[in-house]
Amino acid sequence: MEKKINLIITPQEYNQANHNELWNEISEKSDGITIILNIGADFFISLARGKFYRVKEAINGPKILKNNLILLRPFYILRPEISNNMVNRFNAKLLKQSLKKIVKNIEEYQINVLYYDGIWPTFLDELKLNTKYYYYIMDEVRNDAHNNKTNLKRTRHDKIACEKSDYIYLMSTKLIDKRREYLHKLKVIGNGASQKEYDLNVEKLNNSVGIIGNIRNWVDCDLLTRLIEKRQDIHFGFVGNIESDMQEYMDGILTTYKNVKYYGKVSKGEVHNWYKKFDVILVPYKQNEFMKATRPIKIVESIFASTPAVSIPITGYEECSFIRFAKTVKEFSSEIDYLINNKINIESREYQDFIKLNSWSYKAEEILNEFK
């Protein structure tokens, strides 16, 4: 039997990544070792942004997380995502040296690569290893989120990645539309979650909705403002990082409306208790083709915390008794009332099936079924 290694390239810092529980499940269900390739350190970006810990971790070398799970912070001259072909040839040599410190005879292995950014197959081809590619598409990367316009650079990388990959995992059915020539190797996976132990003393915020996660320009500010204004009887709580281009908006609604409060940034470990605090989780995104293809992880995480959600219509989820869709202020208002008055029945078949089919354990099995 051919020896195999899983190589997972993270799209976010490992400790804060939405999918780190998935990667842990993959390692537990695999016979060989799994190497997590964290966001790289380099001479320029890491130092310019004050990310000195990245350089330190790259120098320290790989870290064993479990028996067969290894976290590697690679070191590059310049991050591969923004490097030209010449620089990336050197970057590839540096990466291969780092991998060989973990597995000396890595040339004898088949490497199954799970990755999230279309640049990686072309880059990893430079390693000259026995590599199979598995592409996980999170959003409609061919479009920009805030205005839905085509992004030519990402479109080019995405097409190359789709062509080179042995299998392609999709966040939603909508992502099939621009990739129909690859139907034979497409599978809709979506986000997952895990059951958590919650603090017993989580204090509920009565008559409340929560906007949780990265507060960015995906939000339909006009719709949300009118909803806040219409529902003065509802407490609107924001939890998460505020991106710079949303700071002015947040300052405005916090100053203007007494029913709005910002609770600050919280760690990934703390966020699950915040899902429990609110009656409903709100996803008031802009409505365009990009957004329609999304599957926000906050929805599945909130359902696992037994808190229902109301969102704009998206193809990443099916509407049900605890996930409601709304397009207008009136519809959002109505669905909030419905969900506050109709709590999730955690004993129902509908809920239990959702938990089973959306667990990270189940998602890991779906992915590994396609690894050759």
Where are these regions (language model features)?
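Membrane-proximal helix-turn-helix segments that form the acceptor-binding/catalytic region
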Residues: Q97-K104, E140, N148-I168
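A short, active-site helix/loop in glycosyltransferases that binds the activated sugar's phosphate group
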Residues: K164-L186, I314
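Conserved donor-binding/catalytic core segment of Leloir-type glycosyltransferases
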Residues: V202-V219, L224-I228, F236-V239
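A charged, aromatic-enriched C-terminal amphipathic alpha-helix characteristic of glycosyltransferases
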Residues: N342-K372
